[in-house]
UniProtKB/Swiss-Prot annotation:
Annotated Gene Ontology cellular component terms: Golgi apparatus
Name of the protein this chain belongs to: Cytosolic sulfotransferase 12
Quaternary structure and interacting proteins, as annotated: Dimer.
GO biological process: brassinosteroid metabolic process; defense response; response to salicylic acid; response to salt stress
Entry keyword set: Cytoplasm, Transferase
Residues annotated for 3'-phosphoadenylyl sulfate binding in this entry: K75, S76, G77, T78, T79, W80, R162, S170, Y228, R290, K291, G292
Tissue expression: Expressed in the aerial parts of seedlings, in roots, leaves and flowers. Not detected in stems and siliques.
Length: 326
């Protein structure tokens, strides 16, 4: 990809190490959406830059028992989950009720909760040990590809899953905003086909979801599995469940309500920092806020495309016990 591309650096192929280039040359590849090519590594498909971030993360990240790692597929409630858990963990340091300058009012959630593989791609020598404890971070890395220290330590993982149809549509619109030139001539029918074949950025989506689903059932004290839909429908109830899992101590009903209000889509999306700001990688913060709805896929997907995704869901999740709200 040329340097004149409108695609952000972390979706491109600039500044790759020799090690990454050597590995990439040996990996299966497919034509991509957003980027010219994606590569299969440990079962999932990635851009070259994100692949490099994953490799560095696997080598250098050392988890602590007190760490909290938020995991999602792309466009599955990442921004919202970051805000909610940041506010929860910091409710004593930054009380929502007593301050008009809460960090979330002046800083985008993505700057408050670092994205592991993104940080490692942009700053390979970044020192995560300098972050205050408990360290709160997020990743899109599959369970299989997590650094060994994450798996072997007592750190906590909160995984948020979203209905794949809404996830796809959110990613589709995100990509069109992010890189209008690269996505202009890529029909949605082709994108749905690639999504359902698993040959899509971050895919196969079912493998990513099921790895964490089974991990949460095998080790419920290590991995908490929440769904975007339940988080939207009963935010206060789910927040209490997250707080209990993270062993945050007693939390007042009023505290929960205040956190939920502060972190609501309406609140966050209307803040100046989330309407006019930019992240260090050049992405406009407003790109992360579209509708935040359940069932918004109906406005974008035709009946036949929705059925195509539904058939994939039925086939891939059969027997897992995992059901999706629509």
């Amino acid at each position: 990809m040329s340097s004149s591309s409108s695609v952000p650096a972390y979706l491109g192929d600039e500044d790759l190490t020799q090690e990454t280039r050597a590995l990439i040359s040996s990996l299966p590849k497919e034509k991509g959406w957003l980027v010219s090519e994606i590569y299969e590594f440990q079962g999932l498909w990635h851009t070259q830059a994100i692949l490099q971030g994953i490799l560095i993360c696997q080598k250098r990240f050392e988890a602590k028992d007190s760490d909290i790692i938020l995991v999602t597929n792309p466009k599955s409630g990442t921004t919202w989950l970051k805000a909610l858990v940041f506010a929860l963990l910091n409710r004593h340091k930054f009380p929502v009720s007593s301050s008009g300058n809460h960090p979330l009012l002046v800083t985008n959630p993505h700057l408050l909760v670092p994205f592991l593989e993104g940080v490692y791609y942009e700053s390979p020598d970044f020192d995560f040990s300098s972050l205050p404890s408990p360290r709160l971070m997020n990743t899109h890395i599959s369970h299989l590809s997590l650094p060994e220290s994450v798996k072997s330590s007592s750190c906590k993982i909160v995984y948020c899953c979203r209905n794949p149809k809404d996830m796809f549509v959110s990613l589709w619109h995100f990509g069109k905003k992010l890189a209008p030139e690269e996505t202009a001539d890529y029909p949605i029918e082709k994108a749905v086909e690639a999504f359902c074949e698993g040959k899509f950025i971050g895919g196969p989506f079912w493998d990513h979801i099921l790895e964490y689903w089974y991990a949460s059932r095998e080790n419920p004290n290590k991995v908490l599995f929440v769904t975007y839909e339940e988080l939207k429908k009963q935010t206060e109830v789910e927040m209490k469940r997250i707080a209990e899992f993270l062993e945050c101590g007693f939390i007042e009903e009023e505290e929960v309500r205040e956190i939920v209000k502060l972190c609501s889509f309406e609140s966050l999306s209307n803040l100046e920092v989330n309407k006019e700001g930019k992240l260090p990688n050049g992405i406009e913060t407003k790109t992360f806020f579209r509708k935040g709805e359940i069932g918004g896929w109906r406005d974008t997907l035709s009946e036949s495309l929705a059925e195509e995704i539904d058939r994939t869901i039925e086939e891939k999740f059969k027997g897992s016990g995992l059901k999706f709200s629509s």
